[in-house]
């Protein structure tokens, strides 16, 4: 299944707020759930499916990519669900988004694809590149890159940067301090339901 490129508001009306997909919010989710519950009992499969879809649309990845991340998480030590979230959160496009250098993950992915971003002084043009503790993220030394990202930071770096990241406005540099903990996830999600959804595939 390819990456979704359709109307984003339609998705958040169905799944609720997804800050990685769009900075718009929807007030329709809770009422639609209540009406659905009153009409018929929601199946466990649908509940798991919706949690999986939240994860996929928030991080902007394909079905195949998400399944691969689940398989990697199953082989790692620790809670499969927590490891899965850590893998997704440490993607370069998500790190750039969480630093406030882009308004959304699709916006961050575009910065990476267009070679505006450096990790440890090397251009990274692969959005799925996995950042590691002590990696530092900087802007390509070109006026266009600096102007674009500085404007994004001014507009979108409003919320608190999560504890596993820091950003220096003076140096225009982001730093990955550590692997993030569960409390720092920027999405309301029940990752165990996602793991259960893939239990027969991963």
Swiss-Prot record:
| Pfam families the record matches | Ribosomal_S4, S4
Signal peptide (residue range):
none
The UniProt entry, under Gene3D superfamilies, shows:
Ribosomal Protein S4 Delta 41, Chain A, domain 1, RNA-binding S4 domain
Q: Which UniProt keywords apply?
A: Chloroplast, Plastid, Ribonucleoprotein, Ribosomal protein, RNA-binding, rRNA-binding
| Protein name, UniProt field | Small ribosomal subunit protein uS4c
Source domain of life is Eukaryota
Gene name in the database record: rps4
Record's GO cellular component terms? chloroplast; small ribosomal subunit
Q: Which InterPro entries match?
A: Ribosomal_uS4, Ribosomal_uS4_bac-type, Ribosomal_uS4_N, S4_RNA-bd, S4_RNA-bd_sf
SMART domains, alphabetically?
Answer: Ribosomal_S4, S4
State the similarity comment: Belongs to the universal ribosomal protein uS4 family.
Tell me, in a sentence or two, what this protein's role is. Answer: One of the primary rRNA binding proteins, it binds directly to 16S rRNA where it nucleates assembly of the body of the 30S subunit. With S5 and S12 plays an important role in translational accuracy.
């Amino acid at each position: 299944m390819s990456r979704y490129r359709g109307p984003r508001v339609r998705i958040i009306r169905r799944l609720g707020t997804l800050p990685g997909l769009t900075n718009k919010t929807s007030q329709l989710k809770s009422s639609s759930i209540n009406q659905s519950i009153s009409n018929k009992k929601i199946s466990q499969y649908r509940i798991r499916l919706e949690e999986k879809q939240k994860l996929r649309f928030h991080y902007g990845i394909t079905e195949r990519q998400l399944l691969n991340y689940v398989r990697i998480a199953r082989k790692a030590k620790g809670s499969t669900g927590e490891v899965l979230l850590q893998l997704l959160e440490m993607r370069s496009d998500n790190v750039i988004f969480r630093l406030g250098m882009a308004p959304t993950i699709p916006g961050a992915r575009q910065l990476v694809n267009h070679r505006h971003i450096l990790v440890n002084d090397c251009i990274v043009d692969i959005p799925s590149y996995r950042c590691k503790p002590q990696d530092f993220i900087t802007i390509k030394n070109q006026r266009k890159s600096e102007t674009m990202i500085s404007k994004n930071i001014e507009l979108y770096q409003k919320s608190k940067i999560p504890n596993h990241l820091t950003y220096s406005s003076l140096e225009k540099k982001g730093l990955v301090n550590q692997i993030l903990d569960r409390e720092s996830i920027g999405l309301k999600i029940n990752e165990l339901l996602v793991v259960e959804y893939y239990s027969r595939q991963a």
